[in-house]
Amino acid sequence: MGPRLSVWLLLLFAALLLHEERSRAAAKGDCGGSGCGKCDCHGVKGQKGERGLPGLQGVIGFPGMQGPEGPHGPPGQKGDAGEPGLPGTKGTRGPPGAAGYPGNPGLPGIPGQDGPPGPPGIPGCNGTKGERGPLGPPGLPGFSGNPGPPGLPGMKGDPGEILGHVPGTLLKGERGFPGIPGMPGSPGLPGLQGPVGPPGFTGPPGPPGPPGPPGEKGQMGSSFQGPKGDKGEQGVSGPPGVPGQAQVKEKGDFAPTGEKGQKGEPGFPGVPGYGEKGEPGKQGPRGKPGKDGEKGERGSPGIPGDSGYPGLPGRQGPQGEKGEAGLPGPPGTVIGTMPLGEKGDRGYPGAPGLRGEPGPKGFPGTPGQPGPPGFPTPGQAGAPGFPGERGEKGDQGFPGVSLPGPSGRDGAPGPPGPPGPPGQPGHTNGIVECQPGPPGDQGPPGTPGQPGLTGEVGQKGQKGESCLACDTEGLRGPPGPQGPPGEIGFPGQPGAKGDRGLPGRDGLEGLPGPQGSPGLIGQPGAKGEPGEIFFDMRLKGDKGDPGFPGQPGMPGRAGTPGRDGHPGLPGPKGSPGSIGLKGERGPPGGVGFPGSRGDIGPPGPPGVGPIGPVGEKGQAGFPGGPGSPGLPGPKGEAGKVVPLPGPPGAAGLPGSPGFPGPQGDRGFPGTPGRPGIPGEKGAVGQPGIGFPGLPGPKGVDGLPGEIGRPGSPGRPGFNGLPGNPGPQGQKGEPGIGLPGLKGQPGLPGIPGTPGEKGSIGGPGVPGEQGLTGPPGLQGIRGDPGPPGVQGPAGPPGVPGIGPPGAMGPPGGQGPPGSSGPPGIKGEKGFPGFPGLDMPGPKGDKGSQGLPGLTGQSGLPGLPGQQGTPGVPGFPGSKGEMGVMGTPGQPGSPGPAGTPGLPGEKGDHGLPGSSGPRGDPGFKGDKGDVGLPGMPGSMEHVDMGSMKGQKGDQGEKGQIGPTGDKGSRGDPGTPGVPGKDGQAGHPGQPGPKGDPGLSGTPGSPGLPGPKGSVGGMGLPGSPGEKGVPGIPGSQGVPGSPGEKGAKGEKGQSGLPGIGIPGRPGDKGDQGLAGFPGSPGEKGEKGSAGTPGMPGSPGPRGSPGNIGHPGSPGLPGEKGDKGLPGLDGVPGVKGEAGLPGTPGPTGPAGQKGEPGSDGIPGSAGEKGEQGVPGRGFPGFPGSKGDKGSKGEVGFPGLAGSPGIPGVKGEQGFMGPPGPQGQPGLPGTPGHPVEGPKGDRGPQGQPGLPGHPGPMGPPGFPGINGPKGDKGNQGWPGAPGVPGPKGDPGFQGMPGIGGSPGITGSKGDMGLPGVPGFQGQKGLPGLQGVKGDQGDQGVPGPKGLQGPPGPPGPYDVIKGEPGLPGPEGPPGLKGLQGPPGPKGQQGVTGSVGLPGPPGVPGFDGAPGQKGETGPFGPPGPRGFPGPPGPDGLPGSMGPPGTPSVDHGFLVTRHSQTTDDPLCPPGTKILYHGYSLLYVQGNERAHGQDLGTAGSCLRKFSTMPFLFCNINNVCNFASRNDYSYWLSTPEPMPMSMAPISGDNIRPFISRCAVCEAPAMVMAVHSQTIQIPQCPNGWSSLWIGYSFVMHTSAGAEGSGQALASPGSCLEEFRSAPFIECHGRGTCNYYANAYSFWLATIERSEMFKKPTPSTLKAGELRTHVSRCQVCMRRT
C-alpha cells in the first residue's frame, strides 16, 4: 500500500504542477489565439486537480512559486513583475495637485507707528568761520521797560531862525510835556484894561451852560503887524490844511504878528508865566511818532556766535538723487563765492534788549497812525498847552464872585479847573518880553469831570462892562468847573525848539492807517556778513527750509522813503505834544493865570473835546466799515505768505534773469526796521466821523534782539497774537550762510507792511489742492473791482458830524444784486512753497481740478448703481493705464455720500530738498495702480504665445446710473497678462467706504490733531473710466461757523454823549481768548509743521527712501536739470484744511504712462466708463425659457482643475445686484507688481525759467468777509493800494458751471471676448474714488457794500508792559491790515536768489497724452472658473416639467455615491462598470449611459453560454474592468479579494435630465465653456479610451458625458477576475485627450514624458453641459 500511495501522490503532484504551470501560462496570456485547444485540455486536467486538492494545494503551491524560473510569460506584463512599479502605485494615491494658484496679494501692512525722529546726523567738520553775517533783522520789540528816570536835559537845540521876529518878543519853544497840574497859582497881575465892550443884552444869568464847542477859528491875521483891530468873530474852522512836505523843516519865517485885537473876554486862567526852566516834569505820554529818522548807522556787528560744525566743502558733484530733507548740516566753509543760502526763518523773538541810548534825532517822522481811543481813566493832568486861538465867546460863565477885574483885565481867576485844552497862543499885546510869572501853587489834580453834552455854540456874550476900579485883584473865586477842551487853535508860530522830552510810554497800537500807496522797491541793502550757525536745539536756526506760510511777517527794514502817500485821515487828537521851551524839563509848574493873549502859537495837539460845529465839507472820508456783506466781490490777488528771506546763501552762479517774481505776500513780521527817511508829508485827510478818541501813547520801539541761534525745529508754536506793525524796514543785504535747521514757524509777527505787488510768477507746479487755511491777515486792499450791482442797503452809517438827527429805522435788507461782472483779474500770487520730494500723503479728495482732456473711451464698464451726484469736480488727470488685472467682480456702487466737511489738514510731509521751479508740469502724477488680478499659474507658459487672439468686443453693457466720479487713474502700461488666476474669493472690503449721506454740515469743529497716517489701502483695480459725472448740485453751504472772537461791528450807535475820556492806562495784555469756532472758510492756512513722514508705501523696485541724511554743503548751483520725476505718492494723509482754490496752473503736458504700481485688492467699482470704441460684439442669442426642472441635489464640488485656457470673453452680463459693502480689509502686504524698476528720483533740476503765464484761473469764490476792523479814522481816499490778501472766504459763490469735460481717455485694448462667463459673485464694494478736484470756481460775486462804520468811541487804554512771553497763543484772528507803507524807491533788481525750497507738490498736471500702445502682451491663460455665484433670484415659474427621459450617468470615482447634477433627478446608484472582456474580446460601456452603472458589483458580472445550452460562470479567464477609486494598492501588490475590493470600486448614479446632455472638450488645460444655452453639470478630464489584458479595451464617445471624468488618474480602472480577485496590472492603459496649442495643430507633435505631478498639464479639460430648458 505504501508504494502505491506514493506513486499516486507523485502523479497527483505532477498533475498539480502541470495545472499550476498552465494556469500561470494562461494568466500570463500565453494563449494568444482564440483556439487554444491545448489550453482547454490542460484545463480539464486542471479541473480534476482542483477537485483533488482539498487542503494540500496550498502547501504544494509554495514550491510552485519557482515559476519565475520558467521563461514562458514575459515578466513585465502582469503585476507579478511589477515591483518596480511601487512608486507608481504610490502615484495612484493621487498625483500631486497642480501648483496652487497664487494667493491674493496680501493686504498692505498697517503702517507702522511714526518712528521717533532719528538722531541728529553726525556733525560735520567745523567749517571755517564765515564772514560776518548780515545784520540780523531787528529783534521783535522788547517789552517796554519801565520808564527810566528822566534823563538829563539834552543839549539845548539850536535856536530856529526867527524871521520877522518882532523885537522884544520871545519865541515860544516847542511844547513841553504837560506837567502835573499845579496848585492854583496866585492871581496873575491884572491884565491891561481892555476897551469897554458894547453893553450886552443883559439877561438873567442863567445857570452855567455846558461849555459849547469852540467856535470856528478866525481868519489868520495878516502877516504884518497892523493896528490892532477889533476882535473878530471866531472864524469857522477850516478844513485841515494839506500837510506840508516831509522834509526836515527849517523853522518857518516868523510872520509878523498882526495888530493886537481888542481885548478879549477874560480867558480861562492862562498858562503859567514862564518862570525859570523848571525841573523836568514827569514823563509825559509818548508823543506821536516822529517821522522816520534817517537810516541809522549800521549797528555794530553782533558778537560772533560759536563756530558751527564745519560742513565738508562739496565739489560740484553731478546732480545726485534728491534725498529727503536731512537734518540741517553745519555751515560749510565759504570758499570763494558760494551760492548764498536762503535766509532762515525768523528766530524766536529775542528777549527784549536793554533800552538803548536814544539815537540821534531823526527827521520828523511821518505822523503816526492814530491810536485807538484809550479807555478813560483819570490820567494825570497834562501841562497846559499853548493857549488856543481865541474861541468865540463862550456862553456866559458863571458870574464871578464879585470879582470885577480891574479895568478889563482878567477877572480874578477861579480856582483852576482842570487844564483846558491848549489855547492858541495869545498875541503878545506888545509886551516886549513876557517874563514868566512865578509858578503858581500846585493845584490838586482835578479828576476829570463827566463830559458834558456838547452845548450849542453860544452867542457872543456882551462885552463886559469895563471895570474901572479893577486894579486890585478880586477875591479868588471858587474853582470853576472844568471847561470843555478848547478848539484847536490856529497853528502858532513855531516856538524855539524845546529839549527833547523823555520818551513817553508806549502808546497803544494805533488803528491801522489807511493803506498808503506802495513804496517803490528799496535799493538792495548792503550785503550782510554771514551769520554763524550754532547748533543749539533750543535756538531757532536761521532760515530752515521755508516754513509753511506763517502769519505775515513783520515789515522788512524800511525802504528808501517813498513818496508821501495820499493824505491820511487826521489822527485823533493826540495827547498834547511835547513842544516845550527848550531847556531842561522843569517840574511842572503850577497852573498860572492865563497870560495875555500871545501870538498865535503853533497848532496845539488836537484837543479832546466835543465835536465842533460841522466844518466845511471835507474830502471824502475813508470808506466806512463794511456794510452788510454783499455778493462776493471780485477776487483779490491771491495772497501768499512769503517767508522771511533768509540770509542769502553764497552767491550762486548767476542765473539768467528770471521773469519778475510775483509779489510776495507779507512775510513774517520783521522786527521794526530803522525808520526810513521821512517821506513827504501827505495831504491832510478829511476829518473822521465820530468823536475822536484820545490817542494812546505810542509805545517805545524795542531794540532789536540779537539774532538767535538756530534752534532745532521746535514743535510749531501756537500762533501768537499779531504784533504791532513795524515800520517798513530797509531791505537787508543777502546774508551768506548756510541754511539752518528748519525752524518751526515763528509766532506770527506783527503784520508787516505789505510788499509791492510782485510780478506775475511763472505758474508753479500745481500743488494738490491744499486745504483752506485759516483766514490770513487782512491783506492790502485789492484793486477796486468794477462796480457791482447795487448791493443791498447797508446798515445805517455812522451819524455825521453835527447834531445827530433822529435815527431812522434801518432799511430792510435789499435783495442781493445780480452777479456783477467778474472782477479784474488779480495778479498772480507767488508760487506756492516747493513741495516735498517725497510725495506727501495723498490728500482727501481734492477739490475739483480743471477738466482733464477728454480721454478716449474705455471699454464700457458694468453699469453701476445710481450714485447721488457728487460735488462737481474737475475731471482729474487722466491716469495712465494700470496693469491689466483680471476683471474684478462688478461691485455695486455704494450710495454716494454728500460731500463731507473738509477733513482736517493733514500734516505736511518732511520738506523735500529744494526742487527747481519746474516748467509747467510735465506729466501728471501717476494714478493709483489698480489691483492686478491674482497671477495665474505661470508654469510652463510660453510667454510669447500666451496671448490669445483678440476676441470680438462684447456687447455694450447697459449704461448704469452715473456713479460717483472716481479719480481717473493714470493708465499703467499694459502688463503681460498672467495666466488667469483662480477667481479669488471676494477681496476684503476696501478700506474706505463711500461717505454716508452727510448730515447738514455741522459747524466746523476746531481742527483736530493730525491723525497718524493711515495704512495704505489696497489699491483698487482701476475702475473703468467713468463718464464724467454730472456736476452735482451745489452742496448746501455749511452753516457758518461761529464767528471768531471779534463779532461784526454793530451798527454804529449814535455818538455817545460826553467828551471822550482820557486815555486810560494801558490794560494788561489780555489772555488770548478762546479760539472762536472757525469762521467761514479762510484763506489757506499756514501749513502745519511737517508731520513725521508716514511710512513710505511699498514702492516698486527702488528701495524705500532712506532717512534724510544731513544735508551736504550747498554745491554750486548746477545747470538747470530736467525736472525730476514725480515722487511716488506717499500714503494718503489726513485731509488738510481746504485751501482756497489757487489759480489753476496751465495744463501740463500729458504724461507718459507710469509704471505699474503695487497690486492691490480689487478697488471699488469704477464709475461708468465712457462707452468703448470697440466694435460691438455679436449678441448671443437668448435661449428660450424652458420649463423649470426640479432642483437636483448639489453635486460635490469638483476639485479645481488646472487653469484652463482663457475662453473668449462672453457678452457682458447685466449688472449684478448691489452687494453689501464689505468690511474693510486688513491692509495687504505689498505685492511686487510687474512694474519695472523706477530709477531713483533725479536731483531736482534748477528752477526753469518761468513758464509762460498760464491762462488765468477761474476766479475763486470770494472768501467770507473778514471781521470788521475797528473803525479807522477816515482819511482822504488813498491811491488804491496794492491788492490786498484775499479776504476771508465768502459765502459759497453761485455754483460753478460744470468743469470742462475731461479729455477722452485713449481707447483701451479690446478685451478678449469669450463665451458667456458664469456670473460671478458680486464684487465687494470698491473703495470710494477720491473726490474730484474742486469744481471751477463760480463767478466772482459782486463786491459787497461797505460795512457799517465801526464804533468810533472805543477808547483804548495804554499798553501795559509786555508780560513775559507767554506760550504761543492760538492762532489769532486775522489782524486788520497794517498801514500802507510809503512808496519806496524802486530798488535795483537783486541778484537771483538761491533756488527756493521745493514747493509743495503741485497739483498733478493734466493728464499726459496716452503713450503709444505697447505691443500686445501674450495672451494670458484663462483663470480657473470662479466659484459658483450666489444663487440667482428666483426665476419665474417654469412650465410644468415633462419627463424627457434623458439619462446621464455620473461616476464619483470614489466610494461615495455621486450626487446628480443640479436640475437632474436620481434614478439609482450603482457601481461603475467600464468594460468586460470575455473570450479575449472586450466590450466597453459608454460611461455616460446607464449601462455603465450596474446596481450590483461582482468580479465576474457575466457568464458565457454556448450553443449547447451550457452556460459557464466564472469558469474562464475572463475579466471585468471597473472604474476605481484613489484607494492605493496594497504594498504587497497581492491581488485584492473579498470585501477588500469594495474600497477600490467607484460608485455611480444614473440621473434623469430634462434635456440633452453632452460633453465639450477644450483640448487645452482650460475648462471649456458650455455653448450658449447650455449649462454646466460638471467639469473633468477628457477620457477617450482604455486597454488592458490582451490589448483589448474600449473607448468613450467624446460627445458622451462618459468621456469627461471628473477625476484624472493615470490608472482610472481596476481589473477583476472570475476567481474573485482584483488588481492593477502593468498592461492597463488609459488614453486621454491631450492639450493642443493652436500654433501646434499642423506640426509634428513633440514627444515628451510627464512624470507624476505634471500629468494634468497636458490632459485636455472638458465640461459636461445640459441644454437649458
Curated annotation (Swiss-Prot):
Encoding gene, per UniProt annotation: Col4a1
Glycosylation (residues): N126
Tissue and organ expression note: Detected in the basement membrane of the cornea (at protein level).
Keyword NADP (UniProt): no
Positions of crosslink type S-Lysyl-methionine sulfilimine (Met-Lys) (interchain with K-1651): M1533
Positions of post-translational 4-hydroxyproline modification: P603, P606, P623, P626, P629, P632
Keyword RNA-binding: no
GO cellular component entries: basement membrane; collagen type IV trimer; collagen-containing extracellular matrix; extracellular region; extracellular space
Record's function text: Type IV collagen is the major structural component of glomerular basement membranes (GBM), forming a 'chicken-wire' meshwork together with laminins, proteoglycans and entactin/nidogen.
One GO process term, biological-process aspect: retinal blood vessel morphogenesis
Disulphide linkage map: C1460-C1551, C1493-C1548, C1505-C1511, C1570-C1665, C1604-C1662, C1616-C1622
Domain notes: Alpha chains of type IV collagen have a non-collagenous domain (NC1) at their C-terminus, frequent interruptions of the G-X-Y repeats in the long central triple-helical domain (which may cause flexibility in the triple helix), and a short N-terminal triple-helical 7S domain. NC1 domain mediates hexamerization of alpha chains of type IV collagen.
Segments of skewed composition (Basic and acidic residues): 289-298, 497-508, 535-545
Assembly and oligomerization: There are six type IV collagen isoforms, alpha 1(IV)-alpha 6(IV), each of which can form a triple helix structure with 2 other chains to generate type IV collagen network. Interacts with EFEMP2.
Disordered: annotated segments: 47-1443
Observed effect of gene inactivation: Mice develop perinatal cerebral hemorrhage and porencephaly. The mutant protein inhibits the secretion of mutant and normal proteins into the basement membrane of embryonic origin. The mutation is semidominant.
Signal sequence segment: 1-27
Location of the region described as Triple-helical region in the Swiss-Prot/TrEMBL record: 173-1440
Name assigned to this protein: Collagen alpha-1(IV) chain
Entry-linked Pfam families: C4, Collagen
Linked residues for S-Lysyl-methionine sulfilimine (Lys-Met) (interchain with M-1533): K1651
